[in-house]
Amino acid sequence: MLDSLLDNDFYKFTMQSAVIKRFPYARARYAFINRGEHAFPPGFGEQLREAVDAMADLSLSVEEKRFLERTCPYLDPTYLDFLSGFRYDPSEVDIVQQGERFELRIEGLWYRTILWEVPLMALISEIWYRMGDGKRDADAIIDMRTRDKIEHYKRLGLKIAEFGTRRRYSYDVHDRVVASLRHHGGDTFSGSSNVHLAMRHGVKPIGTHAHEWFMFHGARFGFKMANSLALEHWVDVYRGDLGIALTDTFTSATFFDSFDKKFAKLFDGVRHDSGDPLEFAAATIAHYERMGIDPRTKTIIFSDALTPERVERIDAFCRGRITTAFGIGTNFTNDVGVTPMNMVIKMTEARPEGQHWMPVIKLSDVPDKNTGDPDMIELAKRVLALSRRA
């Protein structure tokens, strides 16, 4: 079902390169979380198993390597040589189905297992819809809907990227959407998080890092040091490139405590992925002003469950105060007349070199999105004094 090693989100490759350089012997475990309590039909696990096993045959083509060399100079030749030899190992993925319940777990060296999450979620979504009764809208309707959205954003003068790999309806729908965005978007469409589709449609791959980068640092170095060391190590690897920092792994308030003048000047901006976007924008603007930095020289990328209405409201609040860009996922790639799946695959445990397995957690700006061991979540809240903040 997947035809390219690059049918994945860009930040997985940028993180993989950083993990190889900083934590080559670390191990990781991930688990599927069925937030929407979806029921899985008989035979679902077997079909997913077949698709996962087939991923062992994927490899980086010569043309794909040249695309990365040309487009992403911060991915050094040593890493691209590694990626040329990389093959998925399906034995790292354990799939169990009992009745309508479905479980998936991943375990292995972090630099290897880091690539599984996004394609697995895309496969889960596509197989689930294919086996279900729901019928999607016709291609012409999807094309028209996508065109109308990007033309609306164009009239507002915005920068829009497509971030919809994980919960896409299918690869074919995803491909149609990116083609339509490319055709109608002009300068408004800044690129896609999906590296394969960015290459296929001649646009820029977009992304920096995800929550797991910070989650691992919390396990390895402690919650108080997690944000600052995650940022420091990112800078050590990329030397100022890939300069958008994700804020909400241990709450944005905790992040800004670590986002001192050095980081605030060095990073191009921050990404909002949970909580009230207007409150976040106001807090970000205030933080830059306290640092003596003109917020208009910095960028917030908004990427949390965006719709045209939400985007317009955020733009109205931020315009003239701070630069904005928007990463839109499910509203592009699964707005096809069905209910999108509500699921995630998250890192659950990490074993840094020379240490034992330990739980990793995420403390979102929305408590319902917290993930990880409940006791560890409570410990982190105490260590970070989050109860006193509330």
Curated annotation (Swiss-Prot):
GO molecular function: nicotinate phosphoribosyltransferase activity
Pfam families for this protein: NAPRTase, NAPRTase_N
GO cellular component, as recorded: cytosol
Pathway: Cofactor biosynthesis; NAD(+) biosynthesis; nicotinate D-ribonucleotide from nicotinate: step 1/1
Keyword tags: Ligase, Phosphoprotein, Pyridine nucleotide biosynthesis
GO biological process: NAD biosynthetic process via the salvage pathway
InterPro entries in the record: N/Namide_PRibTrfase, NAPRTase_N, Nic_PRibTrfase, Nic_PRibTrfase-Fam, Nicotinate_pribotase-like_C
Residues annotated with Phosphohistidine modification: H211
Reaction(s) the record says it catalyses: nicotinate + 5-phospho-alpha-D-ribose 1-diphosphate + ATP + H2O = nicotinate beta-D-ribonucleotide + ADP + phosphate + diphosphate
Coiled coil, from the record: none
EC numbers: 6.3.4.21
Post-translational modification: Transiently phosphorylated on a His residue during the reaction cycle. Phosphorylation strongly increases the affinity for substrates and increases the rate of nicotinate D-ribonucleotide production. Dephosphorylation regenerates the low-affinity form of the enzyme, leading to product release.
Superkingdom of the organism of origin: Bacteria
PANTHER family listed in its UniProt record: NICOTINATE PHOSPHORIBOSYLTRANSFERASE
Similarity comment text for this entry: Belongs to the NAPRTase family.
Function: Catalyzes the synthesis of beta-nicotinate D-ribonucleotide from nicotinate and 5-phospho-D-ribose 1-phosphate at the expense of ATP.
Protein name according to UniProt: Nicotinate phosphoribosyltransferase
Source organism of this protein record: Chromohalobacter salexigens (strain ATCC BAA-138 / DSM 3043 / CIP 106854 / NCIMB 13768 / 1H11)
